[in-house]
């Protein structure tokens, strides 16, 4: 009887320690992938600069070989940014979406400077056509209230859960990064 109790005790300890080890691995991201989560607005000049300097270098050095996972998170600061985000989300292909995102940031000073929202939307759609999006697809995305609600709810969640107050806000493996925004410091 005592031997059975000892065996049960040691088996329980084994499972307890095995479970603890598993938990610590997931917290420490044992697969070695660094998750870069960026909250940005497509009309934010600092976001465009960050994307142009840091994302492009990360893509070439780390994302392509699976060392870094980059997450763009919508945090629209105005209607133009919201509409650009809605059109960006028309595509479901991740590679195309990231290329489209890069192009929106590169051409931000052109499309975001329109005289009214209709002019801005047309400028965004011209860029979208270069990524195989049709006028009909983009118009449907612009008119999609559920998509708009989803984007705005994600923004609210970012404010609550990540304490995002401005753009760009960056998290590295769930830790807020507040250092310089040049690639050397970021790396």
Pin down the residues of each PLM region.
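Active-site-proximal beta-strand/loop segments in catalytic clefts of secreted hydrolases
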Residues: 39-41, 73-76, 104-105, 173, ...
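C-terminal cap of thioredoxin/glutaredoxin-like
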Residues: 41, 55, 126-187
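Structural alpha/beta surface segment adjacent to cysteine/selenocysteine redox centers
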Residues: 49-129
